[in-house]
Amino acid sequence: MDIQFTTKSQDALGAAVRIAAANGNPQVEPLHLLDSLLQQGEGIATALLSAVGVDVPGLTFQIRGALTGLPSASGSSVSAPQLSQAAYKVLNAAERFAKERGDEYVSTEHLLIALAKDGGPGVSDRLT
């Protein structure tokens, strides 16, 4: 994958991997990415969601609850979480949105748009 990400987007992806690992999830899902965007204290994602009337604390609570329902594994043979097909779909959609706007880098705004449009059940329906 040769998508170029802004620093904030890279931070969000790294946080999504850490969230998945902390929960014992073998794959990084769009839910992890959304949770990581919501955790960026002064990030644009929470500001945009608040501006359109989303109850961000309520959404965060819902997402955290949904994360507990994802498959998990434990033990010494568990490897680092890998991106799921759904997460790849979101990243590719974010890259497409960035290119459509003439942007060279995928920003957190592009990730949020991609999650809303292509995040799949449990993500897109919470954002639209």
Annotated model-derived regions:
Residues 1-128:
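Histone-fold recognition with a strong bias for associated Lys/Arg-rich disordered tails
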